[in-house]
Amino acid sequence: MRFFKFSTSFLLTILSTVLLVLQSCSPNNVTLQNNYKKYFDDAALTGSFGLFDNGSGEFYIYNLAQFKDSSYAPASTFEIVNALVGIETGRIVDEKMMLSVDSAGPIRMDSAFKQTSVPYFMEVARRIGKDTMQQWLDSLQYGSKQMGTAVDSFWLNNTLTVRPDEQLGLVKKLYFGQLPFQKRSQEMVKMLMLQTANANYKMSYKTGLNYKQNGNAVVWIIGWIEENKHPYFFVLQTEGAASSDIKNASMSLLNKILKEQGFFEGKR
């Protein structure tokens, strides 16, 4: 298996670069966006938001303490890592690979990713196996790196947790092909994350929804928006009373923030 061929020096290099986004974050290049509280309040949500302008090196952050210090289960945003490991190890052949995982019948990998088919990626994780998955979590230094005993649910049951700033580092490295996976693996997952493409912008993201022990719902939206071939990376994490509309409310909140930042018109 290709993973075991990594040299120690290569793994150390990857380890040292995973935190580049955070290490470059200093008081001089962070703008605190406290005015975004109005959008969270209007949606009856709490949480944090971070935007990184790759061109200028500037961060725009709402609720900095929570953004860099609070951890949550990644929920279905972990499908980014799950897909990367699956492709890299050959457990996922390509985006057309079909699996029958529930009564709905066979589903393709690309559709499973777009539609957030939890059963599909639970099966992928089982095929990858606990030891191999753990080795990749360690190599990526992804979140708490904890799996527990269940290889097919650790990203859903709060065993594995991750901070918003770590999620930002993940999508940034994916965009630039800087994760310890082959180019093919990263390009395939990047393609799957594309949600909107028009003359003004391209927007790529993955969502996740999970529930805390207190009954509250936690939503993630992580990815990037491109205007004039320039990428901006974002992470939104929200929390609120569980409802069928919380994911839509979080997406609306994200769009309002991005619009205030001047996106969607192709002028950035």
Locations of the language-model features?
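Bacterial Sec-dependent N-terminal signal peptides
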Residues: M1-L32
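Beta-lactamase-like hydrolase cores
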Residues: C25-K68
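Structured C-terminal helix/loop/strand segments within mature extracytoplasmic catalytic/sensor domains
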Residues: S26-Y39, A43, R126-G129, Y175-N200, ...
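Solvent-exposed coil/turn segments that connect beta secondary-structure elements
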Residues: N54-S56, F67, T89-R91, Y142, ...
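Second-shell loop/turn segments in exported
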Residues: Q66-A73, M97-S111, V118-R126, V151-T159, ...
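Active-site SXXK
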Residues: S71-D94, A112, F234
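Short, well-structured active-site flanking segments
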Residues: I87-S103, F181-S185
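Mid-domain, small-residue-enriched loop/turn segments at the edges of structured enzyme/sensor domains
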Residues: E123-F176
